[in-house]
């Protein structure tokens, strides 16, 4: 995925507001659903879904890097944007899997561990715009290749 060449004016302030809004939402979630045995079940379910989907469609190398199972060579229609983290599985195409990108995806893995079954729903509510999606912002917009280096 190519970064947004020139992020729109005011994007940093909007990103900060998105993170703050996300933290407010977190306070509404019952404590026993976050970083708990329940969320771990959701994380492992996500890992299972990621493994099955990756195993079905990956024609590239499958390797473990930085605590993630990386499924390469996925057809473009099987994942959004430049790749997708489902549980502890990073599903991607033929693009470069850099240390920065793995750092970004490792944060998503940690988010899956924290939120479990809630992760897909919360991510959906956060929206498709990475500059306003609190999960992408927390994972690092530069590392995720959403904005050019030096702009975040």
Predicted feature locations:
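N-terminal low-structure segments adjacent to metalloprotease catalytic domains
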Residues: 1-47
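Hydrophobic (often cysteine-bearing) scaffold residues that line and stabilize catalytic clefts
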Residues: 41, 99, 131, 135
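A transmembrane-helix-recognition feature enriched in membrane-embedded lipid enzymes
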Residues: 27-64, 113-124
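Active-site scaffold of zinc-dependent metalloenzymes
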Residues: 69-96
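Post-HEXXH active-site segment of zinc metalloproteases
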Residues: 112-141
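Active-site recognition of the HExxH zinc-binding catalytic motif
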Residues: 100-112
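Short helix/loop segments within enzyme catalytic domains
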Residues: 141-152
């Amino acid at each position: 995925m190519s970064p947004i060449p020139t992020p729109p004016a005011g994007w940093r302030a909007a990103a900060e507001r998105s993170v703050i809004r996300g933290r407010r939402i977190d306070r509404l979630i019952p404590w026993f659903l976050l970083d708990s045995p329940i969320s771990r079940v959701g994380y492992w379910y996500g890992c299972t879904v990621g493994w099955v989907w990756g195993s079905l469609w990956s024609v590239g190398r499958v390797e473990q890097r930085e605590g993630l199972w990386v499924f390469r060579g996925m057809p473009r229609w099987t994942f959004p944007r430049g790749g997708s983290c489902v549980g502890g599985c990073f599903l991607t195409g033929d693009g470069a899997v850099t240390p920065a990108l793995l750092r970004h995806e490792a944060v998503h893995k940690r988010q899956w561990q924290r939120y479990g079954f809630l992760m897909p729903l919360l991510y959906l509510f956060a929206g498709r715009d990475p500059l306003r999606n609190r999960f992408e912002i927390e994972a690092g917009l530069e590392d995720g290749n959403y904005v050019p280096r030096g702009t975040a």
